[in-house]
C-alpha cells in the first residue's frame, strides 16, 4: 500500500544519508536538515565563504547537531543568528508553534568575530524593530562553556544576554561530583525511540494504559 511504499522510500533515503560525511546524523531522529547543514558548510569557501540559510531551531539546540555547531563556532569568523516564532504563520504557512532560525555565517577574516543572537520575534513588526537593536556578541568560549552540547539558547530580551552570562558562572546541571546532588534531564515518551514499549493492537491488555 501507500504506507509501505513511503516506508521503503524513507528507509532507502536514510541508508543513503548514512553513507555520507554528516557527523552526528546518527544521533536522535534522522532529519534531513542535519545533512543539508553540513553540505552548506562543506561547499562554502574556507577563505571568503559566506552562508545565509533558514533552518529549524533544533539545528541550534538538538544533540544531533552538536558536532555541526562546534564546527561552526570553532571555524567560522562570525555567526549571526535570528530566531522567528511562526505565531499566526507570519513567516511560513506551516505549524505556527515552530521556531525558525536565520543563520548568517562568515568565513572571511576581518569580519566581526563571535556569535550574536536575536529573537525570537513573533511578528513582522517585532522583527523590524528588533533587528535594528545591537545584540551582545558572545565569544566562542562563552558559548561553548554554557553546556556540553554547544546548544544556543533563546534570548527574548536584549538584557537576556547579561542574565545568561550571570547564569554561566554556576556549574552545569549535568555536573557529577561525589557527595553532591545531581540533576538529570529526561525527555518525554518518544514515539520513535520508545516504540518497543508501545502496543498498537486494537485491544488494551491488562496493565497497559490507553493513549
Regions found by a protein language model. Give the residues of each.
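Polynucleotide-recognition surfaces of large bacterial nucleic-acid defense/processing enzymes
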Residues: 1-23, 43, 47, 75, ...
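Phosphate/oxyanion-binding active-site loops and adjacent basic polyanion-contact surfaces
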Residues: 25-37, 113
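Structural preference for long, well-ordered alpha-helical segments in enzyme cores
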Residues: 36-39, 67-72
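Short His-Asn-centered micro-motif
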Residues: 54-55, 84
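Conserved short loop/turn motifs at secondary-structure junctions
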Residues: 55-60, 89
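Active/binding-pocket-proximal capping segment
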Residues: 57-59, 70-78
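A short acidic (Asp/Glu
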Residues: 62-68, 92-94
Amino acid at each position: 500500500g501507500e504506507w509501505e511504499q513511503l516506508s521503503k522510500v524513507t528507509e532507502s533515503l536514510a541508508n543513503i544519508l548514512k553513507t555520507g560525511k554528516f557527523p552526528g546524523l546518527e544521533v536522535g531522529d534522522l532529519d534531513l536538515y542535519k545533512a543539508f547543514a553540513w553540505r552548506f558548510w562543506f561547499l562554502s569557501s574556507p577563505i571568503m565563504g559566506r552562508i545565509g540559510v533558514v533552518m529549524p531551531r533544533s539545528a541550534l539546540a538538538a544533540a544531533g547537531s552538536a558536532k555541526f555547531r562546534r564546527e561552526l563556532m570553532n571555524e567560522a569568523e562570525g555567526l549571526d543568528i535570528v530566531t522567528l516564532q511562526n505565531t499566526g504563520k507570519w513567516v511560513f504557512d506551516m505549524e505556527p508553534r515552530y521556531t525558525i532560525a536565520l543563520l548568517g555565517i562568515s568565513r572571511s577574516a576581518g569580519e566581526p568575530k563571535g556569535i550574536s543572537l536575536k529573537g525570537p520575534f513573533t511578528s513582522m513588526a517585532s522583527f523590524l524593530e528588533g533587528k535594528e537593536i545591537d545584540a551582545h556578541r558572545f565569544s566562542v568560549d562563552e558559548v561553548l562553556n554554557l553546556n556540553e552540547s554547544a546548544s544556543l539558547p533563546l534570548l527574548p530580551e536584549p538584557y537576556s544576554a547579561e542574565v545568561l552570562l550571570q547564569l554561566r558562572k554556576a556549574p552545569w546541571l549535568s555536573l557529577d561530583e561525589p557527595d553532591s546532588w545531581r540533576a538529570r534531564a529526561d525527555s518525554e515518551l518518544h514515539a520513535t525511540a520508545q516504540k518497543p514499549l508501545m502496543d498498537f493492537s486494537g485491544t488494551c491488555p491488562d496493565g497497559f494504559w490507553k493513549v
